[in-house]
Swiss-Prot record:
Keywords tagged on the record: Cytoplasm, Methyltransferase, rRNA processing, S-adenosyl-L-methionine, Transferase
Taxonomic source organism: Tolumonas auensis (strain DSM 9187 / NBRC 110442 / TA 4)
Record GO terms (molecular function): S-adenosylmethionine-dependent methyltransferase activity
Reactions it catalyzes: cytidine(2498) in 23S rRNA + S-adenosyl-L-methionine = 2'-O-methylcytidine(2498) in 23S rRNA + S-adenosyl-L-homocysteine + H(+)
Physiological role: Catalyzes the 2'-O-methylation at nucleotide C2498 in 23S rRNA.
Amino acids binding S-adenosyl-L-methionine: S187, S220, P221, G222, G223, D239, D259, D276
First-listed, main subcellular location of the protein, grouped into a coarse class: cytoplasm
GO biological processes: methylation; rRNA processing
InterPro entries in the record: RlmM_FDX (IPR040739), RlmM_THUMP-like (IPR048646), RNA_MeTrfase_FtsJ_dom (IPR002877), rRNA_MeTrfase_M (IPR011224), SAM-dependent_MTases_sf (IPR029063)
Domain of life per record: Bacteria
Record protein name field: Ribosomal RNA large subunit methyltransferase M
EC class: transferase
């Protein structure tokens, strides 16, 4: 088979299909998507032989906005004997190189979630059988491809593989984050996931550390402010609404009752700007660009709400506009975007200046 499979948020299949069509054409790999509403995945069938393999290697997974996972399809098995599913699966991968990890997964839908327990239990005997057949390393080996079993029903499975240097490291492409009991709102998980997604661990001590200052636009009740405070930052929380008392008691938060679109810091020393305001994407994009153009921040994470039908087109337009505006400023600006697991009808965008970051990494913090 010459297919790629992409996991995505249910309801965003058409956006995922539009994105992969654009990206594949840019790499001169042509094909078409098979899409079903609210199924949680998209199949992209390539016309050219070996194009699926080429895309899996050349298309940077981190640059895909709507994809939770990307894998090359080996085979689809239907009508599996419920008394012996393992034998045909092992036979299907006999001609493949040895794999370094096994993930037995399903779609992130209410219907498919009923298979979660089965997938977890089935992975144990399947892992043993694959190792006995020499198709899976004794321990997880990050140098080898990951074998994916994607079950639609308990007798129907897609078999595929991904490359560890170009995939999501998470089961089903979903990071497992626990909601902190003292956080003011569940939105806190959006920013925590964004930090995990966009900031490499080796940079935590210079980009997510105490001593930095941050501004949270539209902060109330403080879900995003909470993530900044727990990392030791001093935060200006901008919102006419109330802030959680627990955050105010930390001594790290200054609550400024003002409009998030008109507020600017009196001292242009904030490192972080974060924003989760409910507003049209174009207006948020313009606001973020203004902050960078006025030198009011060095890094930003913000959400673009997507209630419209053509969401991928809206995202691409706003990111292109932001890129144009940032190109007018001295710097080497990087824009990253992802629909995170904890996002809903929205995506999260990260912007930073590579030059300034390089200076921070070298120890020059100005």
């Amino acid at each position: 088979m010459n297919h790629l499979m992409f996991y995505c948020r249910p309801g965003f299949e058409k956006d995922m299909a539009a994105e992969i069509q654009d990206k594949a054409v840019a790499l001169e790999c042509f094909g078409f998507s098979r899409v079903a509403d609210n199924c949680g995945f998209v199949l992209f069938e390539c016309y050219g032989e070996q194009d699926a393999e080429r895309l899996a290697r050349r298309l940077p997974f981190r640059e895909l906005i709507f994809a939770r996972q990307m894998l090359v399809v080996i085979e689809q098995l239907n009508g599996l004997d419920l008394k012996d599913r393992i034998t045909p699966i092992v036979e299907a991968v006999q001609k493949m190189p040895q794999f370094g990890e096994l993930r037995v997964e399903t779609a992130d839908t209410n219907e498919a979630k009923e298979l979660s327990t089965f997938c977890r239990k089935f992975s144990v005997p399947l892992r043993q059988a694959l190792r006995a057949a020499g198709k899976l390393t004794p321990d997880v080996d990050p140098r080898r491809p990951v074998l994916h079993l994607f079950f639609l029903k308990n007798d129907s499975v897609w078999i595929g593989y991904s490359y560890p240097n170009n995939n999501s490291p998470f089961h089903m492409g979903i990071p497992r984050l626990r909601f902190p009991s003292d956080a003011p709102s569940r939105s806190t998980l959006k920013l925590e996931e964004a930090f995990y997604m966009f900031i490499p661990p080796e940079d935590d001590e210079i980009r997510l550390c105490s001593g930095l200052t941050a501004v949270d636009l539209g902060a109330s009740p403080g879900g995003w402010t909470y993530q900044l405070v727990r990392r030791g930052m001093m935060v200006s929380a901008i919102d006419n609404g109330p802030m959680a008392e627990s955050l105010m008691e930390s001594g790290q938060v200054k609550h400024i009752m003002a409009d998030g679109f008109t507020y600017r810091p009196t001292k242009k020393n904030p490192y972080w700007l974060v924003c989760d305001m409910v507003e049209k994407p174009a207006r948020i994009t313009h606001l973020i660009a203004q902050w960078f153009r006025e030198g009011c921040c060095q890094e930003a994470i913000f959400n673009l709400k997507l209630p419209m039908k053509k969401r991928y087109a809206e995202v691409e337009h706003n990111l292109a506009v932001l890129k144009e505006w940032l190109a007018e400023i001295d710097g080497e600006y990087v824009i990253q975007a992802k629909q995170l697991y904890h996002d809903r009808e929205e995506i999260t965008v990260h912007v930073y200046d590579e030059r300034k970051l390089a200076r921070r990494r070298s120890g020059a913090f100005n």
